[in-house]
Amino acid sequence: MTFSKTVIASVWVLGAATSLARGVAAAPTEHFSYARFGEVSIYRAASEPRDVVLFVSGDGGWNLGVVAMAERLTAAGALVAGIDIRHYLAQVEKSNEKCVSTAVDFENLSHYLQAKLGIKHYLQPTLIGYSSGATLVYATLAEAPEGLFKGALSIGFCPDLDLIKPVCKGSGIEALPRLEKGKLKGVNFLPAKQLSGKWISLQGQIDQVCLAPQTTQFIEKIPGAEIVTLPKVGHGYSVEKNWVPQYLAAYTRITALRPDATPAPVLPAPVADLPLTIVPALGNSSAWLAVFLSGDGGWAGLDRGVAAALAKHGVAVVGWDSLKYFWSPRTPAGAAADLDRVLRHYAREWNKAHVLLIGYSQGADTLPFMVNRLPANSHELVGLTALLGISDSATFEFHLANWLGNASDGIPTAPELAHWKGSRYLCIYGEEDLDSACAQQTGGLGIPVKMAGGHHFGGSYEAIAAEILKHLPNL
């Protein structure tokens, strides 16, 4: 690098000051502090937001330059959370964790932010970053499971980051240590083999910090990544007419993408009010229909992976997003009535006589309450239920406390399992998952199944699907 990112950031501030004089940038509507992010600055759209943006600053911190850019997005209907990368990375380095995995931090921030601000319906967030923040949002998207983020927009991207801790192995992103005079100064990220969402990078052709030829070569190695070249732009982004139109166009392309890989374009009227995603069966369709309640992260990594594996074996899946569903308060009886609607509609629509129910994490916690309250006709359709990573209590509403680690108002799951009605159920848990209630299951209709890994089962989606299919009754 020819110049430091911090010096260039100060140049950008001078350019942004002109924008302030024209009334583009404004003070944040509020601040709050959350976990290792520290103080987060909030910029709201005039109406109910259409998108949520997690915007990470460069090495200069959350200053006028990134503020002006955040304000541009509020005019487009976004709610923007401004993050100071200096504070975040400092807290990451101070933590007791041996390696770095950032996707879960940004996911938790999005959940907390939207609940705290009273967003009516949960919105899948978009990641945006400038300079070192551009690098961080790329790495976060690369390690995130599909469905967590809409995508990421990087402004002034370099593939290196001043991060001393190593990146966690198996997280989807790889990096090599960056040494200067024999001392570890950071990491150099490698091109990701795949990304979980759309990534667009704005690249100044006269950027003397993140050189265009090297950056372009890096990005072109990543499937689906897109680079937007800016002929008259360096690393400072000071002259608005040279980058603002491309910036807003890139943001629009990311947020216009459908977040789910295979959703039903329009759900049928009987279930149109529910957050469902249809995963069609591939090849020869079986006699079984699966309804899958996701974990509290929404219809994302494990849920999508297991559903895709089942679809390969001919089982069509109705995916149910627990994050969006329980964003509004629910009751066991009300949730059971909604499940009844789903079972009756799709069993009739797809001509299926047998239903496989699956729940993961929060979906597993709540599913026993729903099954035990199903009407007799729907109950008779259920041939097997698989509970993945069930805990000892269930919550039927998203609470801020869930993401602060001090939730204590859940309903015990043990009594529901003890009074389980109908067909048998699988209680599948990872051997490292200390919070699972499956290990205590003895007798009754439950079949404990121990698998490798922890709460996320080490990403072994095919193995989970195979275990479930192995127990399907031969009807």
Predicted stretch roles:
Residues 95-119, 329-350, 365-369:
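Alpha/beta-hydrolase active-site loop
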Residues 114-183, 345, 353-411, 416:
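Primarily recognizes the serine-hydrolase "nucleophile elbow" in alpha/beta-hydrolase
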